Structures are given as C-alpha cells and as structure tokens.
A protein has these predicted regions:
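Extreme N-terminal starter segment of soluble prokaryotic enzymes
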Residues: 1-3
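A short, glycine/small-residue-rich beta-strand->loop->alpha-helix junction that serves as a flexible
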Residues: 5-15, 41, 45
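Donor-binding and catalytic core of enzymes assembling or modifying cell-surface/extracellular glycoconjugates
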Residues: 10, 186-275
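Short amphipathic alpha-helix
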Residues: 15-23
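A short beta-strand-loop structural module common to alpha/beta enzyme folds
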Residues: 30-42
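Secretory-pathway luminal glycosyltransferase catalytic domains
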Residues: 46-192
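Leloir-type glycosyltransferase catalytic cores
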Residues: 273-288
Length: 288
C-alpha cells in the first residue's frame, strides 16, 4: 500500500495529489490512498480544497492503515509534535530537507508513506495528461471573471505577486522583490508585446505603486476572488497567454496549467532562502 500525506495550501495539495496519481500509474496493482488527518485543527489557508474545487475522488487511508506503515496523528498539532520526537520508520519516505528530486520515489516497492511537498514536475510528468484532467476547473460563473476571460488574448500576461504572509518570513522574503518584477516585466517584453497585464496579489497597493510605471499596456488588478473563491485567481492565470510567477506553488500551477503552446513563463531561479535547495523548473521556463 502507498499513502500520500496531504497538507498545506492549494498549490501544495496539488503537488501531493499529482504524486498520488503518479504512484497509481507506477504501481497499478497496489492500493494508493491519501492521509488527510492533519487537516483537523489546521487553520491556515482554506483547508482541504481538492474535492470542493475539482470534484476529485480519492481513496482515503484509515487510521489503522496509516499506523501500519507510519504514525497516525488525529490532528495538526500532534503531527507538529510527533514529527520532531518520533523516529523515522523504514516504510516512511520523507522528502529531502533540500527538496532534491529523488527518482527512487516512483520505484519503491512495498508499503510506503510519502510525506513531503514533491514540487518537481518530474514526479508526475509520465502522467501529465491525467494530472491536467484532474485539475480541470469548474466553469466561471461570476460576472467579473467572465468579463475578464473574454478580454484575454494571445498577448495577455498574468503577474502574480505574493507579499502578505511572505513579508518578514526569512524563508521567502527578498526573492521576488521589486527588482525581480522589474526585470521579469522587461524580459517578458523582449518575447512578446503585451496587450494587457492581469495582476494577482495579496498586496494590490504595492503593485500599483511599484509596478504600474513599468506596465506599458492596460492593467487589470484582480481583486474580487477571495476566501474559498481564491482558486479562481489560479484559474485566470492559467487562461492568460503568458505568466510571470512568484516563488509560490499557487502561481507555479497557474503557469503549468496554462495550455498555450507558445506561452512564455518567467520565474525566479531561486525559490527559498536555503543553502543547497533545488527547485528545478520546467526547462522551457525563463529563470531570472
């Protein structure tokens, strides 16, 4: 049996679910299930979102099944404590602290429990079409989203700026700063002539002050998708022709799900402020 732990915001959940799909492909005769137990008492983001957004159905591992190959934690707090105190079991496949790609993940026989973020498309490239199908968004209903969708053309550019919870966080701050976005906008303009920019951010005021002078095309600030409808921003990003992303799994997926065969994606070459960390981006993406 293979069990994949799901935890985090929407982008992280999507990476973990993509691994789940890939394991199903690699081990068709084994049962593959999800461990959702840590969402109990987890108050960050919007909880487990994959079923609500994508209507996905997946086998959920029972407490007994989890205890057989790992440790069962009935809530998020106990997991935070237990992961520091309890020894790693041989059946537990923990992602490297440097997030290095591990090709053995998809070939490990027998019972395995997968705990990590798995933010590397190589973990699921072999079942790319299956992942794309799983992450098919529901149709837009809100007037503002439908109106913007009609305006998007072959030269529309999505820019995702994540500040808010990143400000003051030593792990993330200082990577996608003003200099990054200025360089990314300039670089994008060497590939295409933008017809419009769509700005997605949790700090629109900062974008208006710092980025507006460099945007030489009409700008739309997308501010209306909030709370449990926040995923609509990712959906709109994927509908734009081109993407400038942040060091965020949310905008990574917005760009990856973009099906424009001629898309230009500009991304930060560094993802975290950690030594020896590896975050391989798709080869076709432009890294700065």
């Amino acid at each position: 049996m293979k069990i994949v732990k799901i935890l985090g915001g929407l982008g992280n959940q999507m990476f973990q679910y993509a691994l789940y799909l890939s394991l199903q492909e690699s081990f068709p005769k084994e049962r593959v299930a999800l461990d959702l137990s840590c969402f109990n008492g987890y108050h960050l983001h919007n909880g487990f979102e994959l079923e609500r957004i994508f209507s996905l159905t997946a086998q959920k591992a029972s407490a007994a099944a989890i205890m057989r190959i790992a440790y069962y934690y009935p809530n998020y707090l106990l997991w935070r404590i237990g992961k520091r105190l309890l020894p790693r079991r041989k059946t537990m496949c923990l992602e490297s602290s440097t997030f290095r790609y591990d090709e053995s993940v998809l070939t490990r026989e027998g019972d395995r429990y997968f705990d990590g973020y798995w933010q590397d498309e190589r973990y699921f490239l072999a079942c790319r079409e299956k992942v794309l199908k799983a992450f098919t968004f529901p149709a837009f209903k809100r007037t503002e989203n439908l109106s913007l969708l009609r305006k998007l053309d072959k030269n529309s550019v999505a820019i995702h700026v994540r500040r808010g919870d990143y400000i003051g966080n030593q792990l993330y701050q200082g990577i996608c700063d003003f200099d990054y976005y200025r360089a990314a906008i300039e670089k994008m303009c060497t590939y295409v002539t933008p017809s419009m920019f769509c700005i997605f951010s949790n700090d629109i005021a900062w974008c208006q002050t710092h980025l507006q002078p460099y945007l030489k095309a009409p700008v739309i600030y997308v501010t209306w998708n909030t709370g449990t409808e926040s995923y609509r921003d990712m959906q709109l990003m994927s509908c734009c022709a081109h993407n400038i992303i942040a060091n965020s799994s949310f905008s990574w997926w917005g760009a990856w799900l973009n099906q424009n065969s001629a898309k230009v994606v500009i991304a930060p070459k560094r993802w975290l402020n950690m030594d020896n960390c590896q975050f391989p981006l798709p080869a076709s993406w432009v890294k700065i």
